[in-house]
């Protein structure tokens, strides 16, 4: 009983440390229709302080990333662009946007380039989530954003004329374009990802409820079973390099890698690609709490692929602080939540191994903003 009380008290301390202060700035997103499926987003800093944030995977990103969610008759329309995992430190200046209090920027994009809207009719558009904020080009926290709900009438013929952002490649073997040191690194990453996912599946289904609550914001048996099932599916997919439900590239077949992108997934094709810095920047397996490595990056990308486990995850938030600020429904579908949970799960039974993210370590990490 004493242990349970202590764990609950520490978890309360963690949640308190992660709570948004009353004066925390937020980003307000106003969506308007420009012409048919072409949309304009106006992003405004509604706070009293200047903020610098990562605009990749957000508005102003030139890549075909998921900027908004589309719904037809309350059912989300499939996204056909890319979802990518980014560095959390050493970010380049061109990945960052700074907004003064009250300042705005605009971004125009065509939602028909990353979704099949050829059916036409009424489509509802909205977005929300968290954007990483930075200090000295390192992610140091997060800022929430939310948009209005925009309803548009789509002209089917005009939508069909919009070029798709990504032209599909021919499917190949599960691990494609791999040779030499990169093939070896990916092989190791897949083995490690499978081990991490299996351990995380056990922890999700029958491990500490306090720890599960920390990441997934609920201890319901149905959520624990769903999380465990996704981890088991990832472990199964990572266990074979000659067959499977995804195609995994050692290199970038579409040209969407840059100096800030570790890897990306094309969910509509269940295709995953590693970028150069996946090999040059990441260790195979980190010993640090909530740090990035090749294994959890691969695990993160597998969760995006709906063929591995449906529905595939989204990128509502990155990093421990933002991911643990999500609601239970968002955490269940947030790729980094799975990577972070797996990162802190011992690979050996708890009797012989302790988590690199012990509760005490996490309290210290939060206080240090790491």
Swiss-Prot record:
One of its GO terms (molecular function) is metal ion binding. One of its GO terms (biological process) is proteolysis. The keyword Membrane does not apply. GO terms for cellular component: extracellular region. Residues 20-172 form a propeptide. Disulfide bonds join 178-250, 257-275. It catalyses: Preferential cleavage of bonds with hydrophobic residues in P1'. Also 3-Asn-|-Gln-4 and 8-Gly-|-Ser-9 bonds in insulin B chain. Keywords: Cleavage on pair of basic residues, Disulfide bond, Hydrolase, Metal-binding, Metalloprotease, Protease, Secreted, Signal, Virulence, Zinc, Zymogen. The active site is at residue 301. Its EC number is 3.4.24.39. Its cofactor is Zn(2+). Zn(2+) binds at residues 300, 304, 315. Residues 1-19 form the signal peptide. Pfam families: Peptidase_M35. Its main location: secreted. Binds 1 zinc ion per subunit. InterPro entries: Fungal_M35_metalloproteases (IPR050414), Lys_MEP (IPR029463), MetalloPept_cat_dom_sf (IPR024079), Peptidase_M35 (IPR001384). It is found in: Secreted. Secreted metalloproteinase that allows assimilation of proteinaceous substrates. Shows high activities on basic nuclear substrates such as histone and protamine. May be involved in virulence. Belongs to the peptidase M35 family. This is Neutral protease 2 homolog AFUB_070680. It comes from Aspergillus fumigatus (strain CBS 144.89 / FGSC A1163 / CEA10) (Neosartorya fumigata).
């Amino acid at each position: 009983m004493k242990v349970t009380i202590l764990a609950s008290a520490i978890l309360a301390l963690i949640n308190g440390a992660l709570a948004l202060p009353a004066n925390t700035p937020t980003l307000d997103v106003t969506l308007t229709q420009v012409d048919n499926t072409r949309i304009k987003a106006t992003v405004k800093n509604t706070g009293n302080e200047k903020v610098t944030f990562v605009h990749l995977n957000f508005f102003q990103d030139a890549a075909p990333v998921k900027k908004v969610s589309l719904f037809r008759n309350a059912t989300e329309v499939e996204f056909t662009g890319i979802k990518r995992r980014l560095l959390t430190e050493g970010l380049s200046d061109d990945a960052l946007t700074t907004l003064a209090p009250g300042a705005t920027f605009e971004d125009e994009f065509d939602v028909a380039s990353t979704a099949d809207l050829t059916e036409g009719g009424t489509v509802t558009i909205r977005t929300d989530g968290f954007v990483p904020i930075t200090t000295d080009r390192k992610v140091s926290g997060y800022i929430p954003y939310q948009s209005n709900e925009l309803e548009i009438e789509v002209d089917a013929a005009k939508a069909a004329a919009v070029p798709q952002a990504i032209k599909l490649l021919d499917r190949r073997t599960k691990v494609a374009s791999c040779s030499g040191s990169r093939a070896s690194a990916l092989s190791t990453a897949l083995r490690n990802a499978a081990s991490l996912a299996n351990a995380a599946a056990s922890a999700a289904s029958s491990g500490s409820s306090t720890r599960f609550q920390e990441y997934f914001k609920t201890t319901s048996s149905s959520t624990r079973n769903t999380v465990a099932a996704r981890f088991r599916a990832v472990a199964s997919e990572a266990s074979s390099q000659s067959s499977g439900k995804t195609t995994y590239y050692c290199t970038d077949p579409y040209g969407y890698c840059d100096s800030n992108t570790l890897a990306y997934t094309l969910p509509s094709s269940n295709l995953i690609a590693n970028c150069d810095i996946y090999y040059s920047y990441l260790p195979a397996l980190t010993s640090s709490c909530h740090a990035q490595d090749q294994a959890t990056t691969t695990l993160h990308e597998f969760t995006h692929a709906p063929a591995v486990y449906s529905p595939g995850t989204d990128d509502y938030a990155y990093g421990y602080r933002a991911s643990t600020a999500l609601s239970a429904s968002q955490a269940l579908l947030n790729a980094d939540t799975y990577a972070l949970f797996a990162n802190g799960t011992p690979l050996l039974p708890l009797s012989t191994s302790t988590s690199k993210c012990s509760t005490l370590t996490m309290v210290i990490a939060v206080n240090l903003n790491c």
